């Protein structure tokens, strides 16, 4: 089903199911013999959602040959891809904390459990924004698990298409303090104009010294929906019915790094291959050639004092 301006979802449908997919990837990556990350909450959260495909994946009952262009190397690259992505955002959080930032905002938090699993300094407050059903499910599931947040947690149940800055302020957010912003796995699900508006709003809410971590997909401009559907057909046959072409917004959009620089941020970008190399993970030479999304660039930014 195509996106609409007022569509909504839970963690088993639409955009929400992609959050469950990402959490399943974190669970598998955490169980890797040589793990880059440790997310002990990913597996129980995914099991609680109850999507059979991901449950079978966690149980080891899913033949990895069902994945597009599968091979042992590609299967490992998928696991490593989620590991390096997670590690990048973890490291951005910890770097901001080391620099004295004590206010964190996770946009479209999904099943992100960083509030619970990262070693936050005393006094850190983490705001988690997402659809009300998503926030309620994750909060209750982690409570049922007996999980304790490692920072002061402020769930903010709000759609990012609504007045989320007002909801954030109502939860206690202080725009005069530096903030670490995370927008992980979000931008492709925003129309181009909404992406620009998001960054402009983040900038307006950011004090000097604030940081931002995100990633973008240059190939979203000419995303090949037919190729994506063809590659995912074997997954549908095994019960995973996530139609990415109907969930993402394609077409020309303002380059992320250019937009942020123009707003006063000091920006650096890291290509996926470079990130794999940083963490000692091999990347198949033609990985981007078989991925309909293509390259991924990971972005870290700091707001300059004179922005």
UniProtKB/Swiss-Prot annotation:
It is an enzyme of class 2 (transferase). The keyword Transferase applies. It holds the Pfam family LCM. Keywords: Methyltransferase, S-adenosyl-L-methionine, Transferase. GO terms for biological process: methylation. Its EC number is 2.1.1.-. GO terms for molecular function: methyltransferase activity. It comes from the Bacteria. S-adenosyl-L-methionine binds at residues 130, 159-160. Belongs to the UPF0677 family. NCBIfam families: mthyl_TIGR00027. Exhibits S-adenosyl-L-methionine-dependent methyltransferase activity. PANTHER family: S-ADENOSYL-L-METHIONINE-DEPENDENT METHYLTRANSFERASE YKTD-RELATED, S-ADENOSYL-L-METHIONINE-DEPENDENT METHYLTRANSFERASES SUPERFAMILY PROTEIN. This is Putative S-adenosyl-L-methionine-dependent methyltransferase Mflv_5025. It comes from Mycolicibacterium gilvum (strain PYR-GCK).
């Amino acid at each position: 089903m195509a996106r609409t301006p007022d569509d909504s979802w839970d963690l088993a449908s639409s955009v929400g199911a992609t959050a469950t997919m990402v959490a399943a990837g974190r669970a598998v990556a955490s169980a890797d013999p040589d793990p880059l990350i440790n997310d002990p909450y990913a597996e129980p959260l995914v099991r609680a959602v109850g999507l059979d495909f991901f449950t079978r994946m966690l149980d080891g009952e899913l033949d990895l040959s069902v994945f597009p262009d599968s091979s042992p190397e590609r299967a490992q690259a998928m696991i490593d891809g989620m590991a390096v992505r997670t590690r990048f955002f973890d490291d951005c959080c910890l770097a901001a904390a080391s620099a004295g930032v004590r206010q964190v905002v996770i946009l479209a938090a999904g099943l992100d459990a960083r509030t619970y699993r990262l070693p936050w300094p005393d006094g850190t407050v983490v705001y988690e924004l997402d659809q009300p059903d998503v926030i309620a499910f994750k909060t209750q599931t982690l409570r049922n698990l007996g999980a304790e947040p490692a920072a002061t947690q402020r769930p903010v149940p709000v759609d990012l298409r609504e007045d989320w800055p007002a909801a954030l302020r109502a939860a206690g957010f202080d725009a005069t303090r530096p903030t670490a912003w995370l927008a992980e796995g979000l931008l492709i699900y925003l129309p181009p104009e909404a992406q620009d508006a998001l960054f402009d709003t983040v900038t307006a809410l950011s004090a000097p010294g604030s940081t931002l971590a995100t990633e973008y997909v240059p190939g979203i401009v000419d995303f090949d929906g037919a190729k994506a559907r063809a590659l995912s057909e074997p997954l549908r046959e095994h019960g995973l019915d996530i139609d990415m072409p109907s969930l993402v917004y394609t077409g020309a959009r303002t380059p992320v790094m250019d937009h942020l620089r123009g707003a006063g941020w000091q920006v650096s970008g890291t290509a996926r291959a470079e990130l794999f190399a940083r963490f000692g993970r091999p990347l198949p030479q033609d990985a981007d050639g078989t991925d309909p999304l293509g390259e991924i660039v990971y972005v870290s930014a700091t707001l300059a004092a004179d922005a």
